[in-house]
Amino acid sequence: MSFSHQEIEKKWQAFWEENKTFKTDEQAEGPHFYALDMFPYPSGAGLHVGHPEGYTATDILARMKRMQGYNVLHPMGWDAFGLPAEQYALDTGKHPATFTKQNIDTFKRQIKELGFSYDWDREISTTDPHYYKWTQWIFLKLYEKGLAYIDEVAVNWCPALGTVLANEEIVDGVSERGGHPVERRPMKQWVLRITAYAERLLEDLEELEWPESLKDMQRNWIGKSEGAEVTFKINEHSVNVFTTRPDTLFGATYMVLAPEHKLVTEITTDEQKEAVEAYQKQVALKSDIERTDLAKEKTGAFTGAYAINPVNGEKIPVWIADYVLISYGTGAVMAVPAHDERDFEFANAFGLPIKEVVAGGDVSKAAYTGDGEHVNSDFLNGLNKQEAVEKMIVWLEENGAGQRKVTYRLRDWLFSRQRYWGEPIPIIHWEDGSMSALDESELPLVLPDLEEIKPSGTGESPLANAKDWLEVVDPKTGMRGRRETNTMPQWAGSCWYYLRYIDPTNDEALADPEKLKNWLPVDTYIGGAEHAVLHLLYARFWHKFLYDIGVVPTKEPFQKVFNQGMILGENNEKMSKSKGNVVNPDEIIASHGADTLRLYEMFMGPLDASVAWSTNGLDGSRRFLERVWRLIVNEETGKLNSNVKDVEGNEAFVRTYHQTVKKVTEDFAELRFNTGISQLMVFVNEGNKQEVLPKALIEGFVKLLSPVAPHIAEELWEKLGHTDTITYEAWPTYDESLLVENEVEVVVQMNGKVKTKLVINKGASKEEMEAAALADEKVQAAIGEKTIRKVIAVPGKLVNIVVG
């Protein structure tokens, strides 16, 4: 071993901690740069090698920006509420707070051992009452503005977990955690009106430097559709249907309601009641994903009722079917089987009529979904789709049968969880049926310490068991009330944590407005693609709301977002405990060192690619650092090599250095770390060929290496004679004029055969090339007594002398 990574890494980590090297100086001059990591959920398993990939990327940026004169904010914290900690507590009998603290301590130790340049004075945890005071404050503001409300919602109820799950917590009809069955059940829930921001969330994506694929995921989730809302009468009732194809209204031959639609019980005839109720029970056991699976067999039940098609007065049967969701649109669809695939399959399954209204296909065999001339459509006949859509909307509006409408796939955000380990919702329900919000002065509403945190199983959270905390009396009126027993979802704390880092100890406000102005928006935010939709969408929604009420100065929270790829096991499979292919960073730090792990994870491929872990690759990264060490340090004495001197160096090596500064600077700024590191390797290879190493160039190289491998860089910096940390040294700059070669090697031929090679000025003219070739001793000897017939010079390449 050429250097002891254990000694060097411990030494410099202790130095950084004692000196608070990475503390952000609010008073510092210069531009600001905010480098943010998606903060981790501190699980019991500790850090795995996937975590440091994103953290190393932001750390390289933060370290480089400090050296470029930026005032850098680079914080870390913990997303510590949520289901897994509570589930663990239920399984083991330990309190989630105890378990969470242990996990945070482990994560923090592991992160510090990797040498990340975080300002630990800004550390936050979503479970800290000083933090969640402001999460609750944001909720109160949303409630004040009518954006937080209670609604009866068909929710995913998991009896085994005793809680409601969001759609994204369900995989293939069972809970993601534990694989328990999930059923649909109506419940009173807190909901946030994110739909009020749908258009802005969509439009403002254009201003962001995000990967296009990520923007598309958000666009699809928001799911804007333009069309018309059409009113159908069913007896004395009416039902609104949204359609993007109002032009096909003449082809509507039946209607389908979601089985949960409130009209179903009112319109179902006595003859159909039994079949309808049986079908409703069957559907309650299915998830939305199962219900909308295109490949599955169509099922449904006839209600016995008929709706009137407003455009032609025809009676059409009303069915219920699971492929229509109450949570999407109005929970009712007009079925046009000739021109919609699902409607076509349903019509065939139940023998319902199929009426062609757009020519161009054979609707006896399949639905025709393309454009074409309208037929069997009265005043729309002969028109194409766009003209017919417009004309039908005008007709609907003139006849009071409908209107132009824009809808979004985005649903309001189900915000309550029947769990203990989350932020309490600061609301009181009074015995007279009213409810009121806590006053801001009463925040934080602290989570009570419970012995027993088993779900109540009634739909209420374990907080229903905390009698002293739960029951309140209004001191003015004597009226009794109960606190809200639901808690907030894990998303709540992670929606705004990047704001609290800016001013983490402020008791008077969420953060100081001046500080927010200095640091927002976040310059670069790096994290896993699994948060591409929900976390980023929820955070953008809260940020826009806070902008509207004057708390934050920007419309968007994150200017640039980058999703790192996944680190797979050596067999190209996802790392998991069950497969036994998880790599623990503690072991790598012990065997190879933190610098090696950092270097390897940045060198293994493009940052956004998923790449398999390779022990050989890890060994290669260690060998490179050993080569760096040997280039600069004498292994026997441990001092600087004697060939590192205050000299200028030869032109070729100076050129390699300037090329290295340029490439590393540009590649690191664009997160192309693997190609930047390749160039560092080129420099070391060239350095090993030099008899003398110019000290200034070696110092510049060590600075370039320092963001990737900070411990070894600090040690080398010290050996180069410096007494202070490398952290705030000036980042190297390059000279454009020294990037290119000024001289070029040209071949001299005689009658097409190579006689010699000459090094001449790159810009030499043909005449100068000829003169240099003819003056060369070897050439003169070869010409001898022969006559020169012709000299051909190709600038920068060759001189051919024709003799006879």
Swiss-Prot record:
One of its GO terms (biological process) is leucyl-tRNA aminoacylation. ATP binds at K577. It is an enzyme of class 6 (ligase). Signal peptide: none annotated. Its main location: cytoplasm. A motif ('HIGH' region) lies at residues 40-51. Belongs to the class-I aminoacyl-tRNA synthetase family. This is Leucine--tRNA ligase. It comes from Shouchella clausii (strain KSM-K16). The lineage of its organism: Bacteria, Bacillati, Bacillota, Bacilli, Bacillales. The gene is leuS.
